[in-house]
């Protein structure tokens, strides 16, 4: 199993600038959430023009599958490819085109995203911290994590790829 960092270019519709002042509860109730996002900045606009944007990706690969993780976009699994059947096994969106449906604005479809403390977390379109572990059994784990600012919880997702296995193991860890 190998892991590496690589710059990738993905056509992207850029988001607008965040509101300069914090937005407190203003009846922005969304799918059962309170609507509160403070202290996160809210973005309420996006570009209609597509540009090629460079992202720092982390790849993990074995003889069966290849996975791309995007730390700059919330640590989501953007792409997972079955090398034997020669097809993606999760929805792979080749363009980053946010919709303003997330708690703090931008949210993108495709891949696998992780949400804590609630769905479409406010930071789903923000960078997260990462660490890569090479395990004794030859497997590799990529950890993505953040200290969530609303409730001060640390959330982590670990993606492990093992030699000789055709699946991605995912482990979630929450500290509160």
What is each stretch, according to the model?
Residues 2-37, 57-61, 65-127:
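Acidic-aromatic substrate-binding/catalytic surfaces of carbohydrate-active enzymes
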Residues 173-176:
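Asparagine-centered strand-capping/turn motif at beta-strand->loop junctions
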Residues 67, 80-81, 92, 144, ...:
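Carbohydrate-recognition beta-sandwich/jelly-roll modules
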Residues 24-52, 57-61, 109-167:
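Extended, loop-rich substrate-binding clefts of extracytoplasmic carbohydrate-active enzymes
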